[in-house]
Each structure stands twice: as structure tokens, then as C-alpha cells.
């Protein structure tokens, strides 16, 4: 009892509790708590709303160290936002879970959750209980997800005909910084995924796709390399710049003479001793180099470094080498070349060598930067997307954009059903939910109508960001959908003169759209069930 507060009695002997540090705690209850939550969620959603769609604007995020990030990716914007409010933090988590699960649609899910809470606020003002609103939203989400199944189309996932996959990837990349060359980027992403995809298991191992970037050149110079790029060069400038039919020894053991395992000290008292030590080291290095060459290897890739003496001997013996290659790259090289990683020098045999058709060094512009490209590998299922760009920010944003595109293509390989974008799916779902709401005899029908109105916020935001009159555009498209019974009619964001998203090839994955609706609804349900907040005051913190 003492930890909570003290028990006291009034003049009539009735007990009451004096809560400890009550003056230093802040507390919100009931409707006031709900309104506080809704306001915080709306603030986050409104920030994200202008980033939605192909004409969405980018955000510049500056962190505490002064590093600048310019991005259009919802998950990145929210993860870099400095938010204090506990509900705003939940919105950040919501976007992250969409990113982890689907990879795309991170902005849309936050905008939808914000719209649902905004509608819930109006229902609360009308005196409807939050649990009834939450139940109505749950029913409406179920109807919307069932309706998405009905209006979905199947896309042919075929290695010989990648065009449908390219169109879907183009939709994802349309709102990104790379949209000036989004056809090329979409093709690169599709080719990368199809190269590493396991079509029998309908799965893609992203570990086999490496995305590298180098400042310089233009975005259009980005290319897909069927092999591995390592941000290293040959250890000696006089080594050959290209090795053909490379047999690669992949070493994770130190390339140096063996040392005693115990703590030891070496006393060198004369010049002869020093020369003897030098001779021993040289002989050991030559022995190691001979051992590598005996296996038939003509290239050594080491995780650790080696000194200049060893480097010079490697050059003299005509064995090109690369040093200080990181662990993940070593693994990728081993997968690509079909080689085995050698942790002990004594275990090196010819069976453990990797094979690559060509290993070459590439240099960039006038800088001294060099990279190694390992191509024509034994296992062609490891690929690298090599991005070029004018500055570091563009390259980082291009990496994020390509990540979204790769995720979307992977989702299509797993489940090849799609719905049409441009707000078409949301308008169609809103109409379906409204029709069901009319048949609902209970109080939940108000929440279901509110859910339908919230779904329409997505197409309205798209038209607003494209410089159109949102209400007029929205009502015209909705009326046409009802009249023509065509769920592919959406907002013509790119001003192509047609509202038919099937004709414009604006395609989104069904799995991503379903996830958006269910995640946003779960989040809103959780927020509506909170009616009391207690947190420490400033002095207690």
C-alpha cells in the first residue's frame, strides 16, 4: 500500500487513499484521451498525405548529426521522424510492419489509418460508443477484403514474358526519385528477381541480390551485373587488371606466418637474428603462395590483410590477390562462384576453389576509386544491381526505391493476383462497404459508412497531389464506377486522358492492398479501445 500512496481517514472515519506524487503525474481519461490520440495520429497522417502517389512530394529529413536524407518512402520518413507522442510512435510501427511484410504501400497505410481515426472522431462526437465504432470498422474491413478478392485479376508470372511484372514495378517506382528512368529500373528489378527466384517454391532469396552504389555518372548508367561487385581493388597496382577463367581461393584465415597461441616474446639481439626472422617469414610466405598455386588457383581473395612483403611476393609469383574483403561479400562470392570458404590454410584443396569467367577491375572517372567485378560465375543466381547517381542522396533513395520494387515483384511471384491502382480499388471497396452498410440494422452501420468515407481519402489525396479538384474528380470517378460497373476506374494522376487504370497499366498487388486495410483497421481498433493514459510528469522524469 505504501508504494501506491497513504491511507487516511476523514472526520467521519471513512478511509480514502492519497496517491503518491499525484501532483507530478499527468492523466487523461475517456473521450479526452481518445481525442488526444486521434489528434496525434492525424498529425502524422497529414504529414504523409502529400507524399502519396506519382506526384507526391519528397520530404527532407535532417538528423541530429546534420545528415540530410531526401525521400518519398513512407517507412523511411516515419523512422527518421522525431516523435514523442505514444500514438505517433504506433503509427511509425504500423508503417514499419507494412514495410517488413510487403515492402510497398507504407505511406498509404498511414494515410488510411489517419482517415479512419478522423471519421471515428466525428462518430464519437455524435455519442456512438468507441467499441461499436471498432466493431463496425472490423465488419467493413472484412467486406472490403472480400470485395478485393472479387475484383482482382491474375497476372501471368512467366520468365519468358516479364512485361506484366515490369508494369507492376513501374507503378511502384512512379512516385520515387527514379521515375525519370523508371522503365529501365523496373526492368533491372524484374530481371534481378527472375534470375534468383525459385519458381518451384515460388520464393525469392533477397540474400542473393546485392545493391551497390557509387557516386558519379547518371541514374541511367545503373545496370544489373550477373555476378558480384566488391568495393575493393587488387592488392598491388602492378597486378593484372583482368583475370580470365579465374579459379578463386576464398580465404578467411590470416595470410601470415603462424604465431604461437601462447603469450610470447621474441628477443632479437643482433642483425643476424633479425635477418633470420626475415628469412623465415619470406620462406613461409613463399610456401603459402606455392600451396595456393599447387591447387590450381590463379586468384586469392582474403578476408584479412597481408603485409607489403607478402604483397610483393604475390606479385613476383604472378598470383593476383584481393585483401580486406568483408564477411557478407565473401559469402556472396562463395555462393556465386561455387567455391568453399577456407578457414584454415592447411585445408585448401583444388575442390574448394570457386570459378568465374572473368574478374576485372573497373575505375571511375578521374578519382582513384576502383571496384572488382566478378562475372560469368558458376552459379548465375547471385546478382548485383549497380546504381550510379549524381550524389549520395540520390543513390540512397534509388536503393530504397529498388527495394520496394523488388519486394513487389517477389509478392507477385508468391501470389500473382493484382488490383488496379490510382485509387480504383479503394473507390470500389468504398462502394461495396456502403451498400452493405445500408443492409446493416444495427448501430454499426454508421461506422461502416465512415469506413467507406475513409477509404475515399486515398483517391482524394492522389487527385489533390496531382493538382486537380479532389472532390469533383472523386465524385466523377465514383459515379462512373457505379454506372459502368468497372472497378478499374481511378484517378488520372498522370493526365493521360483516361481514367481506366487497366489501360494505363497502373497495377498494385492484391496481397499489399489487403495488408494495408487489415493493418490500418487493427491499429485503429487498438487506439479506440484506449480510454485512460497515465504518464509521469516532467519533474518525475
From Swiss-Prot:
Give all N-acetylalanine modified positions: 2
Cellular component GO terms, alphabetical: cell body; centrosome; chaperonin-containing T-complex; microtubule
Q: SUPFAM superfamilies of this UniProt entry? A: GroEL apical domain-like, GroEL equatorial domain-like, GroEL-intermediate domain like
In which residues is ATP bound?
Answer: 53, 106-107, 422
Q: From the UniProt record, report the name of the gene that encodes this protein.
A: Cct5
UniProt-listed Enzyme Commission number(s): 3.6.1.-
Task: Please describe the post-translational modifications of this protein.
Answer: Ubiquitinated by the DCX(DCAF12) complex specifically recognizes the diglutamate (Glu-Glu) at the C-terminus, leading to its degradation.
| Protein keywords | Acetylation, ATP-binding, Chaperone, Cytoplasm, Cytoskeleton, Hydrolase, Isopeptide bond, Magnesium, Metal-binding, Nucleotide-binding, Phosphoprotein, Ubl conjugation
General function of this protein: Component of the chaperonin-containing T-complex (TRiC), a molecular chaperone complex that assists the folding of actin, tubulin and other proteins upon ATP hydrolysis. The TRiC complex mediates the folding of WRAP53/TCAB1, thereby regulating telomere maintenance. As part of the TRiC complex may play a role in the assembly of BBSome, a complex involved in ciliogenesis regulating transports vesicles to the cilia.
Regarding protein family, the annotation reads:
Belongs to the TCP-1 chaperonin family.
Protein name per the record = T-complex protein 1 subunit epsilon
A Gene Ontology biological process in which this protein takes part is: protein folding
